[in-house]
UniProtKB/Swiss-Prot annotation:
This is Small ribosomal subunit protein uS12. With S4 and S5 plays an important role in translational accuracy. InterPro entries: NA-bd_OB-fold (IPR012340), Ribosomal_uS12 (IPR006032), Ribosomal_uS12_bac (IPR005679). GO terms for biological process: translation. One of its GO terms (molecular function) is rRNA binding. PANTHER family: 30S RIBOSOMAL PROTEIN S12 FAMILY MEMBER. Keywords: Methylation, Ribonucleoprotein, Ribosomal protein, RNA-binding, rRNA-binding, tRNA-binding. The lineage of its organism: Bacteria, Pseudomonadati, Pseudomonadota, Gammaproteobacteria, Candidatus Pseudothioglobaceae. Belongs to the universal ribosomal protein uS12 family. It comes from Ruthia magnifica subsp. Calyptogena magnifica. GO terms for cellular component: small ribosomal subunit.
Length: 124
């Protein structure tokens, strides 16, 4: 335990909590424009072609965002909405694209977990 003299000379430091999604500026989502849409490969031991986009946000930050689901319609200059949430096997990807919002279409033919992929309920 520290003495009072020690605490007067050197007070206790507050823990600094670092945000996992700094580019969002404490907002739930942010809008941005795609500057590049491409695929990349994940870290070992996984193997795939993950779809990602480089996005310039409304606060002038440039981030890399993951495009989830099967198939997408994004290209350069598409306006998209991003949310937080990293992709564990893609280094540097800390954001997800919100499907079904702005220029991004939902996933076609999706029956389960539709709300996460912006898909409307299908008519029987």
């Amino acid at each position: 335990m520290s003495t009072i003299n020690q605490l007067v000379r050197n007070p206790r430091k507050k823990k600094v909590i670092k945000s996992g999604v700094p580019a969002l500026d404490s907002c739930p989502q942010k809008r941005g424009v795609c500057t590049r849409v491409y695929t990349t490969t994940p870290k070992k031991p996984n193997s795939a072609l993950r779809k990602i986009a480089r996005v310039r946000l409304t606060n002038a930050n440039e981030v890399t965002t993951y495009i989830g689901g099967e198939g997408h319609n994004l290209q350069e200059h598409s306006v998209i909405l991003i949310r937080g949430g990293r992709v564990k096997d893609l280094p540097g990807v800390r954001y997800h694209t919100v499907r079904g919002a702005l220029d991004t279409t939902g996933v076609d033919g999706r029956m389960q977990g539709r709300s996460k992929y912006g898909t409307k309920k299908s008519k029987k």
